[in-house]
Design a protein with these regions (language model features):
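Binding-site signature for planar aromatic cofactors or substrates
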Residues: 1-163
Length: 163
């Protein structure tokens, strides 16, 4: 099982009655991608940190659309992602979820938090990598850090080639 935070908020989109997608950015690991590729299962969990205590889970089958896949650009446009710090070279994949079950529960264990804003760190990191070595620098990072999961499942092999 994998539990990985995702975001920012503009990177998750509902595409139709049974499909959601989120923009997967380069990161320090690739657990979600590796586990989808292993068994196809995914659960997206959304928690309310303000207002009524609620948790929503979207259970389904996932598909990884890497940035170098011919479907990526069309799907990116269709989804209308609005990432405040979206650096094209750091787009790793789009995760499509065919939602087969929706469940909700109380969020009594979720702490109350006040939203302060998005963190600018991803944009700064990607821009620095681009200045130092361009897309090749990001691809080298992905090859080193994202080739496999912590339990040795294959994830990315040098992807993404920016679209």
């Amino acid at each position: 099982m994998n539990v990985s935070p995702k975001g920012p908020i503009g990177t998750l989109r509902v595409l139709d009655d049974h499909t959601v997608a989120y923009l997967d950015m380069v990161g320090s690991g690739a657990e979600t991608v590796a586990h989808i590729r292993e068994n196809g299962r995914i659960v997206v969990m959304l928690c309310a940190f303000e207002g009524p205590p609620r948790i929503l889970r979207l259970h389904g089958r996932g598909e990884v659309i890497p940035a170098d896949d011919e479907r990526f650009d069309e799907l990116y446009e269709r989804a209308g992602f609005e990432a405040p710090h979206d650096v094209e070279a750091a787009r790793r994949a789009i995760i499509l979820v065919d939602v087969t079950r929706v469940s909700d529960s109380c969020g009594y264990g979720v702490p109350l938090m006040t939203y302060e804003g998005e963190r600018p760190h991803m944009e700064a990191w990607a821009e620095k990598k681009m200045r130092v070595g361009g897309e090749a620098e990001i691809e080298a990072y992905v090859a080193k850090k994202n080739a496999e999961s912590i339990d040795d499942l294959p994830a990315f092999e040098g992807e993404p080639a920016s679209s």
